Amino acid sequence: KAVIDQVSNPLGFRWFKFDADKGFFLIGKPLKLMGASRHQDYENLGNATPDALQIKDIELLKAMGGNYLRLAHYPQDPLILETCDRLGILASVEIPVVNTITESDAFTNNCLNMQTEMIKQNFNHPSIIIWAYMNEILLRLKFSNDKPRQQIYFDHVRELAQKLDSLTRKLDPSRYTLLVNHGSWDLYNKVGLTKIPMIVGWNLYSGWYSGIPADFGKFLDRHHKELPNTPFMVTEYGADADPRIRSFSPIRFDKSIEYAIQFHQVYLNAMLSRPFVAGGMAWNLAD
């Protein structure tokens, strides 16, 4: 009889854990999760990226020594996770809830439905260790001139985060939850978003958008001091660079290769020297 349809699921045996003091462990051994975030697009092709280029991205990550991929900010082509399974790249996947929310039942239900579908569709991939559900959700603040109304908005954001986190833990108790914030420490703590997920993600750009690279290590230490029981990762970091631009005296915003290298050296040294930092993802894998 002819085969009409078939479903193939990967099989992988591994166990892992996050520790707020010691970082990440895979099969009982410490492993610093280092890699990149990834958007699914390519020059002149946009989102219609052919399989060969999808696979090439993951092979590039592996070749540069990466062991972790953050799919940002949405589930991507199934081939990506299939390739991560095959190459031994660990991964997180997230739904597209970015920068702001809509305060409505329809929006909330859509978010919950997206999270449910993402988990059920990808549950069997051994490469996945984390389900995520928000990215920089307080970046574009609403109601800045109306503090009482803004507080109501913050309450809605926190309630949605709690619903998504609780749903995720119920659907898959074997994996971790992640909520990703931009570098506004006081704001996210005030709203209560750092207390909800199992792992907190920070997108940090000290020395690029603001500040100096040396501020980065201070931020890492602050998290460990003020949230000592919560594991965390640096889910984004980086400085824009253009391969055509070189400099003997690199400075911020010159987009030179030299400034980007200096930037990465500071960040990598800070993360690698602190066992409590579970990992770091450069932004972005490919542009």
Predicted regions and their residues:
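Substrate-binding clefts and catalytic carboxylate motifs of secreted carbohydrate-active enzymes
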Residues: 127-132, 141, 148-186, 191-287
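Active-site-adjacent substrate/metal-binding segments within catalytic domains
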Residues: 2-143, 162, 177, 226, ...
